[in-house]
């Protein structure tokens, strides 16, 4: 079978070694004669999977002991509601920084539960899209928390600064598309959440890291399935969890640890991004309209000089084993999502194709 590189923004490519192990264990897991999908989530075998996954995740991100790690449902969109429902307490407003599509979507959901103070951080610098630095973000005095999205998958915009707003500001962040791709100082945040389907594992699982002093404040109307305290008190097994996604994510964590951890991923991700952006920047045939300081290393949108060639580019790239390069419907063009599981070899194959395509059609 020819090598296929999947550049989908999510569900995204998984490490080949992880898929191979899952395939080998699919029908007979741990010698039980059954699949991990078929065992009880409350049985000792799966409890061990759950505990190891949490330990490995904590190790990878150096999660402090005063933070709880929850394995939840509902994806990022579920957390758009869960954050205000759990963290507002008796306050009625929260600060929301708008830097792109997903931040704006979180704001729309938050308006159901509070009156958000929205700060538009989007700017244009020399004709390129950018984000105002954190020192210019205007926060209110009475907000329960401040929410932002460090990586916008559709816009291809990243905010790599570490929050430093003082100990009284509870920072909540949507790390769905950048979790585990670079080191982060968890202690600077009150809540970090991430849908699994990009850098963690299969769709269906959502991981929440929450500082323990923020528990116990849920709105009385908060659905139990979104209540952080309930999930924490029940070991993330308030109801039947997505066990297969949890198991596979655990395999990904072990793969990450065996391959140098987050620090090594950070180096490789930088190499991949530099390679791809280098081809784009050194060409008049391709373009990216994000300022270099805010370019995403995970999601690289680009356009062809002649959009009439888009269809041919997608057809030929697919035939070459480079899949899922079509840009989001909101922005069009192309998009290469190059998460942890995408090897440098895959980005090299893409850039080689891009150079050759330009040679023939430029």
Curated annotation (Swiss-Prot):
* One MF term in the entry's GO annotations: O-phospho-L-serine:2-oxoglutarate aminotransferase activity
Q: Name one Pfam family in it.
A: Aminotran_5
Q: List where in the cell it is found.
A: Cytoplasm
Tell me its cofactors.
pyridoxal 5'-phosphate
State which pathway it belongs to. Amino-acid biosynthesis; L-serine biosynthesis; L-serine from 3-phospho-D-glycerate: step 2/3; Cofactor biosynthesis; pyridoxine 5'-phosphate biosynthesis; pyridoxine 5'-phosphate from D-erythrose 4-phosphate: step 3/5
EC main group:
transferase
Q: Which residues in this protein are found as N6-(pyridoxal phosphate)lysine?
A: 198
Quote the record's cofactor note: Binds 1 pyridoxal phosphate per subunit.
Record-listed E.C. numbers: 2.6.1.52
So which domain of life are we looking at?
A: Bacteria
The UniProt record gives the binding positions of L-glutamate as 9, 42
Q: Which GO terms describe its biological process?
A: L-serine biosynthetic process; pyridoxine biosynthetic process
Q: At which positions is pyridoxal 5'-phosphate bound?
A: 76-77, 102, 153, 174, 197, 239-240
Chain ranges passing through the membrane:
none
| Record's keyword terms, sorted | Amino-acid biosynthesis, Aminotransferase, Cytoplasm, Pyridoxal phosphate, Pyridoxine biosynthesis, Serine biosynthesis, Transferase
Catalyses: O-phospho-L-serine + 2-oxoglutarate = 3-phosphooxypyruvate + L-glutamate; 4-(phosphooxy)-L-threonine + 2-oxoglutarate = (R)-3-hydroxy-2-oxo-4-phosphooxybutanoate + L-glutamate
Single GO cellular component annotation? cytoplasm
CDD domains xrefs: PSAT_like
UniProt cross-references to PANTHER family, sorted A to Z: PHOSPHOSERINE AMINOTRANSFERASE (PTHR43247:SF1)
Q: Which family does it belong to?
A: Belongs to the class-V pyridoxal-phosphate-dependent aminotransferase family. SerC subfamily.
Function summary: Catalyzes the reversible conversion of 3-phosphohydroxypyruvate to phosphoserine and of 3-hydroxy-2-oxo-4-phosphonooxybutanoate to phosphohydroxythreonine.
Subunit structure as annotated in this protein's UniProt entry? Homodimer.
From the Swiss-Prot or TrEMBL record, give the protein name. Phosphoserine aminotransferase
Q: From which organism does this entry originate? A: Shigella boydii serotype 18 (strain CDC 3083-94 / BS512)
């Amino acid at each position: 079978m020819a090598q296929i590189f999947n550049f989908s923004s999510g569900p995204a490519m998984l490490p080949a070694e992880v898929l191979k192990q899952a395939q080998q264990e699919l029908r007979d897991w741990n010698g039980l004669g059954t699949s991990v999908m078929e065992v009880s989530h409350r049985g000792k075998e799966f409890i061990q999977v759950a505990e190891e996954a949490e330990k490995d995740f904590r190790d990878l991100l150096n999660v402090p002991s005063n933070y709880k790690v929850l394995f939840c449902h509902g994806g990022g969109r579920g957390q758009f509601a869960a954050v205000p429902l759990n963290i507002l307490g008796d306050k009625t407003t929260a600060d929301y920084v708008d830097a792109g599509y997903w931040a704006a979507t979180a704001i729309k959901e938050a308006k159901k539960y509070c009156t958000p103070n929205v700060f538009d951080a989007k700017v244009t610098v020399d004709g390129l899209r950018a984000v105002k630095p954190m020192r210019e973000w205007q926060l209110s005095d009475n907000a329960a928390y401040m929410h932002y999205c460090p990586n916008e998958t559709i816009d291809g915009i990243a905010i790599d600064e570490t929050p430093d707003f003082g100990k009284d500001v509870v920072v909540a962040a949507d790390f769905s598309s950048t979790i585990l791709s670079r080191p982060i100082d968890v202690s600077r945040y009150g809540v970090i959440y991430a849908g699994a389907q990009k850098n963690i594992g299969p769709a269906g699982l959502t991981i929440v890291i929450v500082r323990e002093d923020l528990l116990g404040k849920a709105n009385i109307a908060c659905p139990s399935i979104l209540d952080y305290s309930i999930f924490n008190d029940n070991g993330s097994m308030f109801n039947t969890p997505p066990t297969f996604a949890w198991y596979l994510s655990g395999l990904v964590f072990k793969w990450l640890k065996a391959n140098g951890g987050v620090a090594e991923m950070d180096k490789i991700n930088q190499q991949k991004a530099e390679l791809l952006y280098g081809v784009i920047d050194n060409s008049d045939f391709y373009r990216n309209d994000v300022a270099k300081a805010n370019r995403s290393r995970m999601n690289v949108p680009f356009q062809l000089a002649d959009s009439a060639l888009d269809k041919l580019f997608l057809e030929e790239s697919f035939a070459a084993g480079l899949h899922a390069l079509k840009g989001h419907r909101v922005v069009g063009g192309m998009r290469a999502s190059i998460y942890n599981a995408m090897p440098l070899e895959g980005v090299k194959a893409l850039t080689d194709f891009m150079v050759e395509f330009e040679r023939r059609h430029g």
